[in-house]
Amino acid sequence: MTTTIRLQREAFDVAAEAARMTHGRTDIGAVVTFTGLCRADENGQPIAALTLEHYPGMAEAEIARHVEEARARWPLLGVTVIHRYGRIAAGEVIVLVATASSHREAAFAAASFLMDYLKTRAPFWKQVETVAGTAWVDAKVADDAAAERWSGKPPEREAAK
């Protein structure tokens, strides 16, 4: 399985990253990508930008640990997680989670699992910049609830259908 985990300030090309994952591969039958963008509005307030901070070293290690958990749960052939940090303007890409498998079910489930983890447990902190000033963003109850569905015993890995 190919795995790419990157934390970076620079923007990245989502299509190029997906193409890199599948280049020369004939065993991949499904690729699921999730791309998170900086919205221009937060609770009715126009957003100029977000500033994302992370714990260097720990963030990469924690993401890698959850990628390994996803591999144990689903028959994955590739995973890419790229997360930006620093100041990110409205409309810019923040995060990419891409998963590849022989079949779509595993790719969809793994991408959802990894994104739920990134939203709730990864060591990132988000500050929003609006015309009213800046404020740190608290975790959302809905994100925690979404992540809870993965806390039970994972289903037995099924052979490719």
Residue ranges with predicted function:
Residues 1-94, 108-112, 116-161:
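N-terminal, polar/charged subdomain of small-to-medium soluble alpha/beta proteins
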Residues 94-101:
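Short glycine-rich or small-residue beta-strand-to-loop segments that form or flank ligand, phosphate
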